[in-house]
Amino acid sequence: LDENSLFLDEGKNLLIEEFGKEYATYFSILSLISSSRTSRREIESVLQKNIGGYLERLENEYHLITRIKPILAKPASRNQKYVLEDNFLNFWFRFIYKYRSTIEIGNFNYVKKVIKRDFSTFAGKFLEKMFIHFLASSNKYTDIGSYWERGNQNEIDIVAINKETKKVLLAEVKLRPEKLNTRILPVKARKLFSLLKDYEFEFKGFSL
């Protein structure tokens, strides 16, 4: 990462023309989502404005974000998050756009330190996707997703359910195996125990 890096302005070049004069608001929303401020309430509390229209366009017109709900959520549930699907844009908004003022004054060492510090947490989300795809391709489960309660409480990275065998796999995903703590999963899953009373639960940790 230095002043000659080609991708410093890549995200901006890709989207600024598309978004037009309101690009700053769109960029702020995408930067917050990439930094795990994923609910409408969280984003609006930072930006201090109604962003319903922006989210709708980002999802349905620009196809940059996707709205997701926790596994087993009812169709009418308002407990939902937004995720930025493109891996490059996720990185760019998380580490380049967010620290653009630091980059503008040439303090690349600071940004490198931030990337080194936060990358394992950032990459963990992509690792989650990989393991979800792996479990889905095994054809052992009827439902697979993530779980969380309101306010992003009791987050469980992967919940895989087999309705036929009445078995549930709960998994924590970390980039580094030493960071795994599967003992917390039964505590986070208390509501799931009541929703899936007759099911057998298994707890695992996935890492590289």
Which positions does each model-derived feature cover?
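A cross-kingdom feature that marks ATP-driven nucleic-acid transaction machinery
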Residues: 78-208
